[in-house]
C-alpha cells in the first residue's frame, strides 16, 4: 500500500507542477541535490564535488543553487557565491524547473515534470554494483518499479563507475535507455589520484587524533531488520596494537540507520556519522571494516586493508541480495569476530593489491581520476553553450 501511495503521489505532483513550465529556463542556472537518506538532502556526494569543481574552474560563470533540507547550515558557502534553498518548497520547485542543468545522485523526484529542454544528470551515490537497490530487491512490487521508471525517464545522462553498474543497475534495475558517461565517480577523483593528505589531516584535526595514531573506520550499511552487528573493537584493538601501534576507531552509521556508537570507549573512538564527507573519512582511514556497503569500491582505489564483517550474510542475502556474488568481492569475508581477528592478523598487502586489481578489471572500472572534468564539460556544453531559451 505504501508503494502504491508513493506512485499515486508521483502522478499527482506531476500534474500540480505543470504551471511552472510557463517559466523561462535560465541557461546560466544550475541546480544540485545531494541525497543523504530518506527525505534528507545536503551539500554532499558526487554533486558537491562537481559543484566545487565548477566554482573553482569557472568562478562566477554560473548561478548555482542547492536544494537542501536545512539552508541555515551553509552560511559560509553562501559567502562563496552558492545559493541554498529549502528542499520541497514552492521556491525550490521554481528553481528546479527553470535551471538548464540539474545534477542529482539518486532516484530523484519522479513526480517532477522536468522539461525537454532541461538536462538532468544522475551521478548515482554508490560505486560498483554490489547490494541490490530498492526497486530490484526480491520483494519489490510494481509500484516501486514504476517510480524507478519515472526517474529513468527524467534522466538525460547517467555517470557510471564501471561496466557492471551499466549492466546491473542502470540498464537492468532502472530500465534506463539513455546515454551513460563512463568516467568514474567525481567524488573518487582525489582518491584515485592518491591525493589524500589534506583530507586526512582535516579529519584528524576535527577529532583531535594524534598524528602517530592509526585510524580504523567502521562503516556498515543499512539493515532492514534494524539490528546492530558491531564487532568487539576492544578485542580488535589488541590484535592491531600488538606491534606497539596505536589505533583510533571511527564509527560511521548508514544514513538510514538508527544505530549509535554509545558502546565504544570515548578515549579511543568517535562517532563520525554526522561528518559531512564520507570520502574524507576514507582518505583518513588506514583500515576499513564494513559489510555490504558500496564504500568498498571507493576505498579499493587506496589499496589499503579492508575486511567484510558479515555475521548476518544469509539473512541479508535473502532480504536484499547482490548483483555480484560476495565471494567475488576483493576483500576477506568474516562471518564472526574470530574470523575477523584472524583475517586482520594474517593480512598480506601484496595479495590485497592483486585481489583489488583483479576486481577492478572484472567489474570494468571507469575510474580515471578526471570524472569532475569530464562531467563539468558536459554541464558547460548543455547550459551556457547551448540555446535553451
For each feature predicted by the language model, list its residue ranges.
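Short acidic-hydrophobic, aromatic-tinged amphipathic segments that line or gate anion-handling sites
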Residues: 83-88, 269-274, 329-343
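A donor-sugar binding/catalytic signature common to diverse glycosyltransferases
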Residues: 102-124, 129-131, 275-319
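C-terminal amphipathic helix plus adjacent low-complexity
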Residues: 1, 196, 337-389
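Active-site and donor-binding regions of nucleotide-sugar-utilizing enzymes
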Residues: 30-194
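Catalytic binding pocket for nucleotide-activated donors in carbohydrate/polymer assembly enzymes
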Residues: 294-363
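Donor nucleotide-activated moiety binding/catalytic core segment of transferases
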Residues: 85-100, 255-297
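Membrane-proximal basic amphipathic "stem/tether" segments
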Residues: 1-38
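Conserved catalytic-core segment of nucleotide-activated headgroup transferases in glycan assembly
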Residues: 42-58, 172, 186-263, 334, ...
Amino acid at each position: 500500500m505504501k508503494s502504491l501511495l508513493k506512485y499515486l503521489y508521483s502522478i499527482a505532483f506531476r500534474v500540480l507542477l505543470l504551471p511552472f513550465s510557463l517559466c523561462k529556463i535560465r541557461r546560466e542556472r544550475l541546480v544540485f541535490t545531494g541525497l543523504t537518506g530518506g527525505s534528507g538532502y545536503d551539500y554532499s556526494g558526487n554533486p558537491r564535488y562537481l559543484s566545487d569543481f565548477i566554482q573553482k574552474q569557472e568562478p562566477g560563470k554560473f548561478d548555482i543553487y542547492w536544494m537542501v533540507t536545512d539552508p541555515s547550515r551553509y552560511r559560509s558557502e553562501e559567502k562563496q557565491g552558492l545559493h541554498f534553498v529549502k528542499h520541497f518548497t514552492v521556491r525550490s520547485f521554481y528553481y528546479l524547473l527553470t535551471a538548464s542543468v540539474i545534477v542529482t545522485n539518486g532516484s530523484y523526484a519522479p513526480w517532477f515534470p522536468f522539461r525537454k529542454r532541461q538536462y538532468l544528470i544522475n551521478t548515482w551515490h554508490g560505486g560498483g554494483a554490489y547490494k541490490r537497490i530498492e526497486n530490484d530487491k526480491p520483494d519489490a512490487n510494481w509500484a516501486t518499479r514504476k517510480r524507478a521508471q519515472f526517474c529513468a525517464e527524467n534522466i538525460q545522462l547517467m555517470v557510471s563507475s564501471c561496466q557492471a553498474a551499466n549492466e546491473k543497475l542502470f540498464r537492468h534495475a532502472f530500465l534506463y535507455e539513455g546515454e551513460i558517461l563512463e568516467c568514474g565517480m567525481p567524488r573518487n577523483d582525489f582518491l584515485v589520484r592518491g591525493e589524500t593528505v589534506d583530507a586526512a589531516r582535516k579529519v584528524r584535526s576535527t577529532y583531535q587524533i594524534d598524528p602517530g595514531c592509526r585510524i580504523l573506520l567502521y562503516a556498515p550499511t543499512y539493515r532492514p531488520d534494524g539490528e546492530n552487528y558491531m564487532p568487539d573493537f576492544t578485542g580488535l584493538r589488541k590484535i592491531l596494537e600488538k606491534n606497539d601501534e596505536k589505533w583510533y576507531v571511527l564509527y560511521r552509521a548508514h544514513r538510514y540507520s538508527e544505530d549509535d556508537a554509545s558502546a565504544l570507549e570515548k578515549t579511543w573512538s568517535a562517532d563520525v556519522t554526522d561528518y559531512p564527507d564520507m570520502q574524507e573519512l576514507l582518505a583518513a582511514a588506514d583500515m576499513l571494516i564494513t559489510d555490504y556497503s558500496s564504500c568498498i569500491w571507493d576505498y579499493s582505489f587506496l589499496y589499503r586493508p579492508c575486511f567484510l564483517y558479515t555475521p548476518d550474510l544469509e539473512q541479508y542475502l535473502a532480504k536484499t541480495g547482490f548483483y555480484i556474488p560476495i565471494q567475488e568481492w576483493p576483500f576477506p569475508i568474516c562471518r564472526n569476530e574470530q574470523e575477523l581477528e584472524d583475517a586482520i592478523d594474517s593480512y598480506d598487502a601484496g595479495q590485497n593489491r592483486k585481489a583489488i586489481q583483479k576486481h577492478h578489471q572484472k567489474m570494468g572500472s571507469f575510474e580515471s581520476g578526471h570524472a569532475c572534468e569530464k562531467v563539468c564539460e558536459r554541464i558547460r556544453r548543455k547550459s551556457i553553450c547551448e540555446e535553451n531559451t
